[in-house]
A protein has these predicted regions:
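Eukaryotic nuclear low-complexity, Arg/Ser/Gly/Pro-rich intrinsically disordered regions
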Residues: 8-9
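Amphipathic, hydrophobic secondary-structure cores in small proteins
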Residues: 35, 39-82, 86
Length: 98
């Protein structure tokens, strides 16, 4: 004999979340007083495959504005990019868009 209570049915229900799975996550690089601008440009080219011009644009945004969103997409890939940037000793974070 199988009895189901309302409490049990409630615990088995799918959790309600406001975050959609397809919401893009941002990879943000922050300015630091250590790395040379040419080095940061080179890292962007290697990690993201950016052209020199696009890499320089992001580097200058980091330099003058203090941060730049260098990539946006699925969370797993964004986490991977943040780890790669940390490997090059850049200050990078993962942010969920508002």
């Amino acid at each position: 004999m199988l009895f189901r209570s309302a409490a049990m049915a409630e615990t088995l229900a799918e959790p309600k979340t406001e975050t959609r799975l397809d919401t893009p996550w941002n990879v943000v690089v922050h300015n630091d007083p250590v790395n040379l601008m040419s080095y940061v440009t080179m890292v962007f080219q290697k990690v993201f495959g950016y052209s020199r011009e696009k890499a320089q644009t992001h580097m200058l945004e980091v330099h003058y504005r203090g941060r730049s969103i260098v990539w946006s997409g699925v969370r797993e890939r964004a986490e991977f990019y943040v780890q790669q940037l940390h490997g090059y000793l850049l200050l990078a974070t993962l942010e969920k868009p508002e």
